[in-house]
Amino acid sequence: MGVKKPDLNDPVLRAKLAKGMGHNYYGEPAWPNDLLYIFPVVILGTVACTVGLAVLEPSMVGEPANPFATPLEILPEWYFFPVFQILRTVPNKLLGVLLMASVPAGLLTVPFLENVNKFQNPFRRPVATTVFAIGTVAAIWLGIGATLPIEGSLTLGLF
């Protein structure tokens, strides 16, 4: 199987070429154009920007650890806040661990929601869009609640 070549005898294509609309009509092959020329330039540019920023503006690693001064509450990184909140608020620890494990299991089921639907527009896929919206709101709610004291963490201190 080779590169699809245009039929230059096609009158529609000849009309487009005459108007200057035929460039890239059939696309360019990824080999060798993209893989040998464009990708390395982008990768080297990204590495150069990262190294340049690291040299020009080095960030501090943080305060040195003090084993004799422990913070009152140890919080995980920000992206673990929702599952930390689940583990913190569920009284049964086994149930909390099972609920934490249900997060990736639920994420694995998302592609199979309405997978027979041929539409890519999210407004024409109501079930998947609703699941995404509810999951996003729940993750933000739990993430904000994880930063608050345990007493007002589920209500975010509003009630």
From Swiss-Prot:
It comes from the Eukaryota. Gene3D superfamilies: plastocyanin oxidoreductase (1.10.287.980), Single helix bin (1.20.5.510). It is a multi-pass membrane protein. Its main location: plastid. GO terms for biological process: mitochondrial electron transport, ubiquinol to cytochrome c; photosynthetic electron transport chain. Keywords: Chloroplast, Electron transport, Membrane, Photosynthesis, Plastid, Thylakoid, Transmembrane, Transmembrane helix, Transport. It holds the Pfam family Cytochrom_B_C. GO terms for cellular component: chloroplast thylakoid membrane; mitochondrion. The chain crosses the membrane at residues 35-55, 94-114, 130-150. One of its GO terms (molecular function) is ubiquinol-cytochrome-c reductase activity. It is found in: Plastid, Chloroplast thylakoid membrane. Component of the cytochrome b6-f complex, which mediates electron transfer between photosystem II (PSII) and photosystem I (PSI), cyclic electron flow around PSI, and state transitions. Belongs to the cytochrome b family. PetD subfamily. HAMAP family: Cytb6_f_subIV. The 4 large subunits of the cytochrome b6-f complex are cytochrome b6, subunit IV (17 kDa polypeptide, petD), cytochrome f and the Rieske protein, while the 4 small subunits are petG, petL, petM and petN. The complex functions as a dimer. This is Cytochrome b6-f complex subunit 4. It comes from Adiantum capillus-veneris.
